[in-house]
Amino acid sequence: MSKTPFLIAAAFALCATTLFADHAEARERSRAVQRTAQGGSVAVERSNARFDSQRQRTWQADGQGNANAARSGSLSGAHGGSAGYDRSAYRNADGSAGRQGSAYANGPNGGNASTSGGLSRDADGNVTGARSTTATGANGNRYTGSTTVSDGTLVHTRSCTNAAGDAIACPRGN
């Protein structure tokens, strides 16, 4: 027995249910692209019953060895969660370069986290950077950490507190 009629019927049924989906399940998507010899940009938006999201990206170069790029995005969930990020990087003709970035997340039940930092290299090759991170659980426990690097030395500090603000031991990851 041939499976072709069954597959055609299944495809038709799938298409028919997609056409008649109620508005709450409708999906939307848009995309815009621009390009030139020196750079460009892309922007994308999506929306459906589960989430809404946006993201953007840009880049630019001058033909002399200097270039930069950036990207960002965000997401909002139907149940209250949200997240986002923002990053950029550059490179100069003299050999210096760097990058910066930040990100956040907010849970629907009260937890949240955020991080930000950057790293740079000067024309002589010296590298410096820092990053800080905070996270708070729905129960109020909080982690705060920072990392720095300079002259080849890496330093990390961290602290944890409970909802009352009392110091507690920071949990170790697996």
Predicted features, each with a name:
Residues 1-10:
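Bacterial N-terminal signal peptides that target proteins for export
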Residues 14-23:
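C-terminal segment of classical bacterial N-terminal signal peptides
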Residues 24-174:
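Low-complexity repeat regions of mature extracellularly deployed or surface/particle-associated proteins
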